[in-house]
Amino acid sequence: MIPRHSLPFDVGTLFSVLIRSSSARLQSDVEKAYADALGVHKSLLLPSVRAGIHMAILAVSKSDTIVAGPAYTCGTVHVAMALSGAPTRLIDSGPGAFLMPSDGIYAATEPGCALVLSEVYGLSYDQELLRNACGKGPGLRILDMAMGIPDPGRTRKLEATDIALFSFGWGKPMYAGWGGIACFQDSELADRVRDIRDQWTVPETFGLRFRHGNSALIQTAMNHRSLYGLSHEPHLYRVLRKTASPSHEQGCQLKISGSLPPQWTSPMTPLNRQLALYNLRHSAQDAGLRRSQAEIYSGLLVESGAVRGPGSKELPQSHFPILLPSAVRDKMCDYLRGRGIDTGTLFPFPAGLSRDLYPRAAKTAGEVITLPLGPSITLDEVRMVSHRVKDGLQALGC
Protein backbone atom coordinates (compact mmCIF):
# COMPACT_ATOMS: atom_id res chain seq x y z
CA MET A 1 0.00 0.00 0.00
CA ILE A 2 1.23 3.51 -0.83
CA PRO A 3 1.50 5.40 2.51
CA ARG A 4 -0.26 8.72 2.98
CA HIS A 5 2.95 10.26 4.42
CA SER A 6 6.34 10.05 2.74
CA LEU A 7 9.45 10.13 4.93
CA PRO A 8 12.74 11.70 3.78
CA PHE A 9 14.73 8.55 4.66
CA ASP A 10 14.35 4.79 4.99
CA VAL A 11 15.21 2.33 7.77
CA GLY A 12 18.72 1.79 6.39
CA THR A 13 19.48 5.49 6.55
CA LEU A 14 18.02 5.71 10.03
CA PHE A 15 20.27 2.89 11.28
CA SER A 16 23.29 4.58 9.72
CA VAL A 17 22.41 7.82 11.48
CA LEU A 18 21.64 5.96 14.71
CA ILE A 19 25.17 4.52 14.77
CA ARG A 20 26.61 8.02 14.41
CA SER A 21 24.21 9.70 16.83
CA SER A 22 26.45 9.05 19.83
CA SER A 23 28.86 11.57 18.33
CA ALA A 24 26.17 13.98 17.17
CA ARG A 25 26.88 17.64 16.94
CA LEU A 26 25.75 19.92 19.71
CA GLN A 27 22.42 21.70 19.44
CA SER A 28 24.25 24.94 18.66
CA ASP A 29 26.13 23.29 15.78
CA VAL A 30 22.90 22.12 14.15
CA GLU A 31 21.36 25.56 14.61
CA LYS A 32 24.37 27.19 12.94
CA ALA A 33 24.25 24.71 10.04
CA TYR A 34 20.62 25.63 9.35
CA ALA A 35 21.24 29.37 9.76
CA ASP A 36 24.17 29.27 7.33
CA ALA A 37 22.33 27.15 4.75
CA LEU A 38 19.15 29.23 4.89
CA GLY A 39 20.78 32.65 4.99
CA VAL A 40 19.32 33.80 8.32
CA HIS A 41 21.03 35.41 11.30
CA LYS A 42 19.94 32.76 13.80
CA SER A 43 17.99 29.53 14.07
CA LEU A 44 16.74 27.70 17.15
CA LEU A 45 15.85 24.03 17.61
CA LEU A 46 12.48 23.58 19.30
CA PRO A 47 10.39 20.82 20.88
CA SER A 48 7.74 21.43 18.18
CA VAL A 49 6.30 24.08 15.89
CA ARG A 50 3.29 24.54 18.17
CA ALA A 51 5.68 25.38 21.01
CA GLY A 52 7.54 27.77 18.71
CA ILE A 53 4.35 29.62 17.80
CA HIS A 54 3.46 30.12 21.43
CA MET A 55 7.00 31.07 22.46
CA ALA A 56 7.13 33.64 19.67
CA ILE A 57 3.85 35.21 20.79
CA LEU A 58 5.07 35.35 24.40
CA ALA A 59 8.31 36.97 23.27
CA VAL A 60 6.50 40.04 21.87
CA SER A 61 3.26 40.11 23.87
CA LYS A 62 2.08 43.22 25.65
CA SER A 63 -1.13 43.80 27.56
CA ASP A 64 -2.97 44.94 24.43
CA THR A 65 -1.51 42.46 21.92
CA ILE A 66 -3.97 40.57 19.74
CA VAL A 67 -3.22 37.39 17.80
CA ALA A 68 -4.65 36.81 14.32
CA GLY A 69 -4.46 33.60 12.33
CA PRO A 70 -6.26 31.15 10.06
CA ALA A 71 -9.47 29.30 10.84
CA TYR A 72 -8.33 26.50 8.52
CA THR A 73 -5.17 24.96 9.94
CA CYS A 74 -3.96 22.26 12.31
CA GLY A 75 -5.78 22.36 15.64
CA THR A 76 -2.47 22.62 17.50
CA VAL A 77 -1.95 26.05 15.91
CA HIS A 78 -5.20 27.27 17.45
CA VAL A 79 -4.10 25.88 20.81
CA ALA A 80 -0.75 27.66 20.58
CA MET A 81 -2.50 30.94 19.74
CA ALA A 82 -5.07 30.63 22.52
CA LEU A 83 -2.60 29.60 25.21
CA SER A 84 -1.10 33.09 25.25
CA GLY A 85 -4.33 34.45 26.70
CA ALA A 86 -4.35 37.30 24.17
CA PRO A 87 -7.53 38.09 22.22
CA THR A 88 -7.59 35.89 19.11
CA ARG A 89 -9.04 36.74 15.72
CA LEU A 90 -9.47 33.90 13.25
CA ILE A 91 -9.63 34.57 9.52
CA ASP A 92 -11.68 32.53 7.07
CA SER A 93 -10.04 30.99 4.01
CA GLY A 94 -10.18 32.71 0.65
CA PRO A 95 -12.83 31.67 -1.90
CA GLY A 96 -11.79 28.29 -3.30
CA ALA A 97 -8.46 28.54 -1.48
CA PHE A 98 -6.64 26.83 1.39
CA LEU A 99 -4.92 30.01 2.63
CA MET A 100 -6.20 33.29 4.05
CA PRO A 101 -7.04 36.06 1.53
CA SER A 102 -5.14 39.34 1.63
CA ASP A 103 -8.27 41.40 2.36
CA GLY A 104 -9.13 39.12 5.28
CA ILE A 105 -5.64 39.52 6.72
CA TYR A 106 -5.78 43.29 6.31
CA ALA A 107 -9.16 43.54 8.04
CA ALA A 108 -8.15 41.36 11.02
CA THR A 109 -4.73 42.84 11.78
CA GLU A 110 -3.66 46.04 13.49
CA PRO A 111 -0.34 47.69 14.33
CA GLY A 112 1.65 45.64 16.83
CA CYS A 113 -0.42 42.46 16.55
CA ALA A 114 0.95 38.95 16.12
CA LEU A 115 -0.06 37.32 12.83
CA VAL A 116 0.16 33.56 12.27
CA LEU A 117 0.43 32.50 8.62
CA SER A 118 -0.03 28.74 8.30
CA GLU A 119 1.18 27.45 4.94
CA VAL A 120 -0.95 24.29 4.97
CA TYR A 121 0.36 21.42 2.81
CA GLY A 122 3.41 23.59 2.09
CA LEU A 123 1.39 26.03 -0.05
CA SER A 124 3.14 29.39 0.18
CA TYR A 125 1.74 32.90 0.44
CA ASP A 126 2.49 35.24 -2.43
CA GLN A 127 5.05 37.63 -0.93
CA GLU A 128 3.86 40.75 -2.76
CA LEU A 129 0.24 40.16 -1.83
CA LEU A 130 1.32 39.41 1.73
CA ARG A 131 3.26 42.66 1.91
CA ASN A 132 0.13 44.59 0.90
CA ALA A 133 -2.05 42.57 3.28
CA CYS A 134 0.27 43.42 6.18
CA GLY A 135 0.16 47.14 5.46
CA LYS A 136 -0.98 47.89 9.03
CA GLY A 137 2.36 46.65 10.34
CA PRO A 138 1.96 43.54 12.52
CA GLY A 139 4.54 43.51 15.29
CA LEU A 140 5.26 39.84 14.57
CA ARG A 141 4.66 37.60 11.57
CA ILE A 142 4.87 33.90 12.37
CA LEU A 143 5.33 31.94 9.15
CA ASP A 144 4.11 28.47 10.08
CA MET A 145 5.92 26.44 7.41
CA ALA A 146 5.55 23.19 9.34
CA MET A 147 4.41 21.31 6.24
CA GLY A 148 7.05 22.76 3.93
CA ILE A 149 10.71 22.33 3.04
CA PRO A 150 13.11 25.21 3.81
CA ASP A 151 13.91 27.33 0.76
CA PRO A 152 16.94 29.64 1.13
CA GLY A 153 15.43 31.90 -1.52
CA ARG A 154 12.53 32.63 0.84
CA THR A 155 14.24 32.53 4.21
CA ARG A 156 16.89 35.06 3.14
CA LYS A 157 14.04 37.53 2.58
CA LEU A 158 12.65 37.24 6.10
CA GLU A 159 12.25 40.59 7.82
CA ALA A 160 13.16 41.55 11.37
CA THR A 161 9.60 40.95 12.58
CA ASP A 162 9.36 37.51 10.93
CA ILE A 163 9.82 34.03 12.36
CA ALA A 164 9.78 31.03 10.01
CA LEU A 165 9.00 27.66 11.60
CA PHE A 166 9.64 24.21 10.11
CA SER A 167 8.53 20.92 11.65
CA PHE A 168 10.53 17.72 12.10
CA GLY A 169 7.42 15.91 13.36
CA TRP A 170 5.46 12.96 11.98
CA GLY A 171 4.05 13.26 8.48
CA LYS A 172 6.12 16.33 7.60
CA PRO A 173 8.58 16.48 4.65
CA MET A 174 11.43 17.28 7.07
CA TYR A 175 10.52 14.48 9.53
CA ALA A 176 13.37 13.77 11.95
CA GLY A 177 11.45 11.91 14.64
CA TRP A 178 10.82 14.94 16.82
CA GLY A 179 11.07 18.71 17.04
CA GLY A 180 11.22 21.74 14.81
CA ILE A 181 13.32 24.78 14.02
CA ALA A 182 12.75 28.54 14.01
CA CYS A 183 14.58 30.95 11.69
CA PHE A 184 15.18 34.63 12.48
CA GLN A 185 16.75 37.67 10.89
CA ASP A 186 16.55 39.60 14.17
CA SER A 187 19.00 38.35 16.80
CA GLU A 188 17.27 40.11 19.69
CA LEU A 189 13.95 38.41 18.93
CA ALA A 190 15.75 35.07 18.60
CA ASP A 191 17.37 35.58 22.01
CA ARG A 192 14.00 36.28 23.65
CA VAL A 193 12.54 33.10 22.19
CA ARG A 194 15.64 31.14 23.24
CA ASP A 195 15.23 32.31 26.83
CA ILE A 196 11.65 31.00 26.88
CA ARG A 197 12.68 27.72 25.26
CA ASP A 198 15.47 27.17 27.77
CA GLN A 199 13.08 27.80 30.68
CA TRP A 200 10.60 25.23 29.36
CA THR A 201 12.88 22.51 28.05
CA VAL A 202 13.42 19.43 30.22
CA PRO A 203 16.86 17.77 30.51
CA GLU A 204 17.94 15.35 27.79
CA THR A 205 18.08 11.98 29.57
CA PHE A 206 18.93 8.45 28.45
CA GLY A 207 15.24 7.58 28.75
CA LEU A 208 14.30 10.46 26.46
CA ARG A 209 16.89 9.38 23.90
CA PHE A 210 15.57 5.81 24.02
CA ARG A 211 11.93 6.89 23.57
CA HIS A 212 12.73 9.18 20.65
CA GLY A 213 14.90 6.54 19.00
CA ASN A 214 12.30 3.82 19.52
CA SER A 215 9.58 6.07 18.11
CA ALA A 216 11.55 7.02 14.99
CA LEU A 217 12.54 3.41 14.31
CA ILE A 218 9.00 2.02 14.61
CA GLN A 219 7.41 4.85 12.64
CA THR A 220 9.96 4.54 9.83
CA ALA A 221 9.73 0.75 9.65
CA MET A 222 5.94 0.71 9.69
CA ASN A 223 5.81 3.30 6.91
CA HIS A 224 7.49 0.82 4.55
CA ARG A 225 5.01 -0.57 2.04
CA SER A 226 5.59 -4.17 3.06
CA LEU A 227 4.36 -3.38 6.58
CA TYR A 228 2.19 -0.32 6.06
CA GLY A 229 -1.06 -2.06 5.22
CA LEU A 230 -0.65 -4.48 8.13
CA SER A 231 0.31 -1.74 10.56
CA HIS A 232 -2.87 0.17 9.71
CA GLU A 233 -5.25 -2.67 10.51
CA PRO A 234 -7.42 -1.08 13.23
CA HIS A 235 -6.41 -3.18 16.26
CA LEU A 236 -2.70 -3.33 15.47
CA TYR A 237 -2.62 0.33 14.48
CA ARG A 238 -3.78 1.43 17.94
CA VAL A 239 -1.07 -0.66 19.61
CA LEU A 240 1.69 0.54 17.29
CA ARG A 241 0.63 4.16 17.54
CA LYS A 242 0.82 4.02 21.31
CA THR A 243 4.18 2.22 21.23
CA ALA A 244 5.68 4.53 18.62
CA SER A 245 4.63 7.73 20.34
CA PRO A 246 7.35 9.13 22.61
CA SER A 247 4.64 10.84 24.64
CA HIS A 248 0.93 10.77 25.28
CA GLU A 249 -0.48 14.24 24.81
CA GLN A 250 -3.91 14.87 26.25
CA GLY A 251 -5.49 16.82 23.41
CA CYS A 252 -5.66 20.51 24.14
CA GLN A 253 -5.38 20.24 27.92
CA LEU A 254 -2.02 21.95 28.05
CA LYS A 255 -1.65 22.86 31.66
CA ILE A 256 -2.09 20.05 34.14
CA SER A 257 -0.84 20.85 37.63
CA GLY A 258 1.37 23.56 36.15
CA SER A 259 3.06 21.23 33.64
CA LEU A 260 3.12 21.13 29.86
CA PRO A 261 3.00 18.05 27.60
CA PRO A 262 6.25 16.78 26.03
CA GLN A 263 5.49 18.39 22.64
CA TRP A 264 6.10 21.69 24.40
CA THR A 265 9.07 20.77 26.56
CA SER A 266 11.07 17.78 25.24
CA PRO A 267 14.28 18.68 23.37
CA MET A 268 15.56 17.02 20.23
CA THR A 269 18.00 14.18 20.94
CA PRO A 270 21.28 13.40 19.11
CA LEU A 271 19.42 11.07 16.72
CA ASN A 272 16.84 13.76 15.93
CA ARG A 273 19.59 16.31 15.35
CA GLN A 274 21.52 14.00 13.03
CA LEU A 275 18.36 13.28 11.03
CA ALA A 276 17.64 17.01 10.83
CA LEU A 277 21.11 17.54 9.33
CA TYR A 278 20.55 14.68 6.89
CA ASN A 279 17.28 16.30 5.80
CA LEU A 280 18.95 19.67 5.35
CA ARG A 281 21.56 18.17 3.02
CA HIS A 282 18.87 16.48 0.91
CA SER A 283 16.16 19.16 1.12
CA ALA A 284 16.67 20.63 -2.36
CA GLN A 285 16.49 17.17 -3.96
CA ASP A 286 13.34 16.26 -2.00
CA ALA A 287 11.70 19.59 -2.83
CA GLY A 288 12.41 19.06 -6.53
CA LEU A 289 10.88 15.59 -6.49
CA ARG A 290 7.75 16.77 -4.69
CA ARG A 291 7.41 19.69 -7.10
CA SER A 292 7.53 17.32 -10.09
CA GLN A 293 4.93 15.05 -8.51
CA ALA A 294 2.64 17.97 -7.66
CA GLU A 295 2.86 19.20 -11.25
CA ILE A 296 1.61 15.81 -12.45
CA TYR A 297 -1.31 15.79 -10.00
CA SER A 298 -2.18 19.36 -10.93
CA GLY A 299 -2.10 18.69 -14.66
CA LEU A 300 -4.03 15.42 -14.60
CA LEU A 301 -6.59 16.29 -11.94
CA VAL A 302 -6.96 20.05 -11.43
CA GLU A 303 -6.19 21.63 -14.78
CA SER A 304 -8.19 18.91 -16.51
CA GLY A 305 -11.22 19.94 -14.46
CA ALA A 306 -11.64 16.57 -12.73
CA VAL A 307 -11.32 18.03 -9.21
CA ARG A 308 -10.64 21.32 -7.45
CA GLY A 309 -7.19 21.84 -5.97
CA PRO A 310 -3.90 23.72 -6.32
CA GLY A 311 -3.00 24.90 -9.80
CA SER A 312 0.46 24.75 -11.31
CA LYS A 313 1.37 28.17 -9.88
CA GLU A 314 0.73 27.17 -6.25
CA LEU A 315 2.25 23.74 -5.74
CA PRO A 316 2.16 22.04 -2.30
CA GLN A 317 5.01 20.10 -0.70
CA SER A 318 3.75 17.77 2.02
CA HIS A 319 0.65 16.31 0.32
CA PHE A 320 -1.44 17.20 -2.70
CA PRO A 321 -4.89 18.36 -1.51
CA ILE A 322 -7.95 17.93 -3.69
CA LEU A 323 -11.53 18.93 -2.96
CA LEU A 324 -14.57 16.74 -3.59
CA PRO A 325 -18.21 17.12 -2.51
CA SER A 326 -18.44 16.21 1.17
CA ALA A 327 -21.04 13.52 0.39
CA VAL A 328 -18.47 11.46 -1.53
CA ARG A 329 -15.21 12.49 0.17
CA ASP A 330 -15.03 9.55 2.58
CA LYS A 331 -16.25 7.14 -0.09
CA MET A 332 -13.37 8.23 -2.32
CA CYS A 333 -10.90 7.60 0.52
CA ASP A 334 -12.32 4.08 0.91
CA TYR A 335 -12.23 3.54 -2.86
CA LEU A 336 -8.56 4.50 -3.08
CA ARG A 337 -7.61 2.50 0.00
CA GLY A 338 -9.20 -0.56 -1.56
CA ARG A 339 -6.80 -0.07 -4.46
CA GLY A 340 -3.70 0.24 -2.31
CA ILE A 341 -3.55 4.01 -1.89
CA ASP A 342 -3.83 5.53 1.58
CA THR A 343 -5.02 9.13 1.80
CA GLY A 344 -5.73 11.68 4.53
CA THR A 345 -8.43 14.23 5.35
CA LEU A 346 -6.47 16.95 7.13
CA PHE A 347 -7.72 19.20 8.66
CA PRO A 348 -11.00 18.62 10.54
CA PHE A 349 -13.01 21.72 11.38
CA PRO A 350 -12.62 22.51 15.10
CA ALA A 351 -15.67 21.56 17.14
CA GLY A 352 -15.64 24.86 19.04
CA LEU A 353 -15.76 27.11 15.98
CA SER A 354 -18.88 28.45 14.29
CA ARG A 355 -19.39 27.18 10.76
CA ASP A 356 -21.44 30.31 10.09
CA LEU A 357 -18.51 32.58 10.94
CA TYR A 358 -15.99 30.57 8.91
CA PRO A 359 -18.04 28.95 6.13
CA ARG A 360 -15.20 28.50 3.64
CA ALA A 361 -12.89 26.87 6.19
CA ALA A 362 -15.71 24.55 7.27
CA LYS A 363 -16.49 23.64 3.66
CA THR A 364 -12.85 22.88 2.87
CA ALA A 365 -12.47 20.75 6.00
CA GLY A 366 -15.36 18.55 4.87
CA GLU A 367 -14.18 18.19 1.28
CA VAL A 368 -10.39 17.81 1.36
CA ILE A 369 -8.46 14.63 0.54
CA THR A 370 -4.67 14.62 0.67
CA LEU A 371 -2.82 12.53 -1.92
CA PRO A 372 0.73 11.27 -1.25
CA LEU A 373 3.86 13.14 -2.33
CA GLY A 374 7.54 12.41 -1.75
CA PRO A 375 10.14 9.63 -1.94
CA SER A 376 7.64 6.88 -1.06
CA ILE A 377 5.88 7.23 -4.42
CA THR A 378 7.30 7.30 -7.95
CA LEU A 379 6.28 9.65 -10.76
CA ASP A 380 4.58 6.77 -12.58
CA GLU A 381 2.64 5.95 -9.42
CA VAL A 382 1.54 9.57 -9.13
CA ARG A 383 0.04 9.22 -12.60
CA MET A 384 -1.57 5.95 -11.54
CA VAL A 385 -3.08 7.56 -8.43
CA SER A 386 -4.45 10.40 -10.57
CA HIS A 387 -6.16 7.91 -12.87
CA ARG A 388 -7.53 5.99 -9.86
CA VAL A 389 -9.08 9.23 -8.60
CA LYS A 390 -10.74 9.74 -11.97
CA ASP A 391 -11.95 6.13 -11.95
CA GLY A 392 -13.34 6.68 -8.47
CA LEU A 393 -15.20 9.80 -9.55
CA GLN A 394 -16.87 7.82 -12.30
CA ALA A 395 -17.67 4.90 -10.00
CA LEU A 396 -19.18 7.24 -7.40
CA GLY A 397 -21.26 9.05 -9.99
CA CYS A 398 -19.47 12.39 -9.75
What are these regions (language model features)?
Residues 87, 140, 341-342:
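Residue-level detector of anion-binding/catalytic polar loops
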Residues 56-108, 336:
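Conserved PLP-anchoring active-site segment centered on the Schiff-base-forming lysine
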